[in-house]
Curated annotation (Swiss-Prot):
Natural source organism: Rickettsia massiliae (strain Mtu5)
GO CC terms, sorted: cytoplasm; Holliday junction resolvase complex
Tree of life domain: Bacteria
GO molecular function: ATP binding; ATP hydrolysis activity; four-way junction DNA binding; four-way junction helicase activity
UniProt protein name: Holliday junction branch migration complex subunit RuvB
Amino acid sequence: MISHYIRFKIMTNILLSPEKSENDQELPIRPSYLQEFVGQQQIKENLSVFIKAAKSRNEHLDHTLFYGPPGLGKTTLAKIISNEIGGNFKSTSGPAILKVADLAAILTNLERNDVLFIDEIHRLNTAVEEVLYPAMEDFELDIIIGEGSAARSVKITLPKFTLIGATTRLGLLSNPLRDRFGIPMRLNFYNTEELKKVLNRASKLLDIDLTDSGSEEIAKRSRGTPRIALRLLRRIRDFAAVDGKSRVDKEISDFGLNRLEVDRIGLDSNDYRYLKFIADNYNGGPVGIETIAAALSEQRDALEETIEPYLIQIGLLQRTPRGRVITIAAFEHLKMPVPNQSHHQFNIFNEHE
């Protein structure tokens, strides 16, 4: 048993290493509590109710699932929940939990009211999922110790913890796992005013002199995504500094965004490659996602998670049973002639490779 315990501790140190963001500068501007979090108003209000109710009953918060496009605050909300309920925050990801022993190492090191955050939870393998079910429902862990005739089952009682899962691909989550989350919440794209609030808050924390017009210009071109807005703010600050400007206004924001190849509605060079490929080679589509991925030398997951959601959101792309189709609005935005409408609609129902 001691050797197994040591092995569990070693694996825990690897799997639950402190989470690092894409940019360490993001850490000081992450909100720590719900009242500091901008946007997702209904989610915030509901979470506040659920957290207060759980604390009043001296119970753990029910397991929570955040889903939606990347960059909208799933990880941040998980950390906020941990702060609000006063538990430790432990973070890992679906791909990092390869074996049942990996999961056991994590679960046996949790304490009461801890928050276990699993990013990309849709990528857990089936064997790990099956061990997770009783841990979520009954707070028990069944593991096999030993091999062959010496093998025996050991049941370990776990403390009452809260599992928070995050995924950009809800459809890839198995039904049994999805049904075990008592609080499923979808995060939606931000509007311009919400992004301006995110930018204004960040500019104060980063000591950036950001004007209202500069904030609006960045917000309008940030794809409805706070993570992108904050990244663009930092890069435009660089352009302003090198250009000898003390403040970030609309002029320097527009200049910087153009240099970064971000157009007036937030499309970048990758979006243009995607749209032009379908327009030039398939007359607007339909075309299969695997064909697009191969032609652009991109992973299918990258296209489905980072490029397509925003294009669909703003009405430039449609997913059909036959494949991807770009809309008339997309042709107009590309300043390309719109194909014959009847022919374009007819093609949607004919198979293309």
